[in-house]
């Protein structure tokens, strides 16, 4: 069998690009190898943060998200950004599960109930999503739109719900239909420790309008709770109903949409709407269409608007299906990233996949040994390149990230310099076997060691772009505007391997 010419991906963890030289451990390090590559090899900058990696706009990237996106060959959206994006591009408003539930209730002259954590917190839900659901129900002809508000005060300040409630009151006034039907603190509605007596108060409130208190408006109900010394999280079951208004309890034929996207605190209240539930005795059990925004648990037999995104045909799985061999190699600190996260959350190796782990040094903090285990890792990586055994190799050098996190500038510079030496050996090996190499990063860190705003030590990741360098015999010219999820399709194209349909990332050369 002839020796394989590997396609290698080397991820320099935490190696971001920043124009400013001040406090930049990367540009201030002595790096003849990387400087030479940047001067003489095809290279570009790619995005590793925010919506480009499925995070909220402007949010810095991290290693888990970065490696997941690289391996998937598509942007992997977190639930918050997935729903936000679906709303902005109209996919939410056309979602078949939501459309069917709303339309069925409208046709029967029934109500559409929307429940969820009314908060801009963004941890379990986002009120912008709930706003969109109300507008969607109204646009599809629902006359009775009832909003059941779970109040936050944990992921938001303890008494901050008034603004949210006013916004929804204004929305209903503008629509000329619908109203806030109930208030209850998340302590009751979103318990996750089997305190069913709490959950029952929220269930009875929504299904029977059974409440400790009734007020004409939501803001009045909230003010009364504050007067009772109850912060948002602990607001007792409160019915909102002005004189002459009909009850907004959930009844047969209604549609109920639960707008929380995070599962752990949504499961219990959702299970109370399942026929087989026995956590407490329900006085009423309405026959309804109940829609979970995301799948709270695989064993909850209710409708789900946004099923879990499948990460089928990641780079590793696809290479395996194509009968190719691959190696994943890193030291302890980033081993999980080049294996579990790179494989889309799959623990086991694919057929043809091998793994090598180099132990990270046993030091209190990595500024004490900025080169970490890079020399040994490089030795093993070079041997793997020359072995002729592997079609593809993925390697992570953790130094810039792990030493960057210590905040010790001089150590970060040393980390970069030790990497430069290592990269020189890797490039030499690749050229020797006529292989191909992409050098990049999963996010930035070491390029900003002092916070420009506070003047204090900067130990966090950045939201800056990362370099992408090609070494190999192909005449490659990069396109601008790439992101981490473009790397897998690019590597497949470089090796003349078919690209699976699931990979929506782009090939990064012209």
Curated annotation (Swiss-Prot):
Active site: 63
EC number, as in UniProt: 5.4.2.12
Source species, domain of life: Bacteria
GO cellular component terms, semicolon-separated: cytosol
GO-annotated biological processes: glucose catabolic process; glycolytic process
Cofactor notes: Binds 2 manganese ions per subunit.
Co-factor(s): Mn(2+)
Binding annotation for Mn(2+) 1: 401, 405, 461
Catalytic activity: (2R)-2-phosphoglycerate = (2R)-3-phosphoglycerate
A Pfam family hit: iPGM_N
CDD domains for this protein: iPGM (cd16010)
Residue ranges of coiled coil: none
Keyword DNA-binding belongs to the record: no
Binding site for substrate: 124, 154-155, 186, 192, 262-265, 334
Disulfide bond annotation, renumbered to this chain: none
Keyword terms, alphabetized: Glycolysis, Isomerase, Manganese, Metal-binding
One GO MF term: phosphoglycerate mutase activity
Residue sites binding Mn(2+) 2 per the record: 13, 63, 442-443
EC class name: isomerase
Function as written in the Swiss-Prot or TrEMBL entry: Catalyzes the interconversion of 2-phosphoglycerate and 3-phosphoglycerate.
Family label: Belongs to the BPG-independent phosphoglycerate mutase family.
Subunit structure: Monomer.
Protein name: 2,3-bisphosphoglycerate-independent phosphoglycerate mutase
Organism: Aliivibrio fischeri (strain ATCC 700601 / ES114) (Vibrio fischeri)
Gene name per UniProt: gpmI
